Amino acid sequence: MRALLIIAGLALFLVVCNASQVNEQSSLNEVLSAIFAVEEPQERDDCLGLFSSCNPDNDKCCEGRKCNRRDKWCKLKLW
């Protein structure tokens, strides 16, 4: 009887430890997702995001980007 009680206690302990580890892992995944989430800043709804096809004569790229005349797509404006 004592051995059965010890085995049941160990099984319960393993279940609790596993549940807390799964919860901790999901929390870690949420934090990492938030850190590495790439969101393009868009001031206007009609602006073009990074690497979008554009017209250099009518530059509609979002703030911080400029339509490249050679490639005709929005690139980061470095200066």
Swiss-Prot record:
PROSITE patterns xref list: HWTX_1
Its signal peptide is 1-19
Question: Where expressed (tissues)?
Answer: Expressed by the venom gland.
Sample GO molecular function, one term: toxin activity
List the GO terms this entry assigns under cellular component, sorted alphabetically: extracellular region
**Which UniProt keyword terms apply here?**
Disulfide bond, Ion channel impairing toxin, Knottin, Secreted, Signal, Toxin
Top-level taxon in the UniProt lineage? Eukaryota
Propeptide residue intervals? 20-45
Q: Where in the cell is it found?
A: Secreted
Which cysteine-cysteine pairs are annotated as disulfide bonds in the entry?
A: C47-C62, C54-C67, C61-C74
Query: Which InterPro entries does this entry report, sorted A to Z?
Result: Huwentoxin-1, Huwentoxin_CS1
The keyword Nucleotide-binding is annotated on this UniProt entry: no
- Record-stated family: Belongs to the neurotoxin 10 (Hwtx-1) family. 34 (Jztx-26) subfamily.
Task of the protein: Probable ion channel inhibitor.
Q: What is known of its domains?
A: The presence of a 'disulfide through disulfide knot' structurally defines this protein as a knottin.
What is this protein's record name? U16-theraphotoxin-Cg1b
Report the source organism.
Answer: Chilobrachys guangxiensis
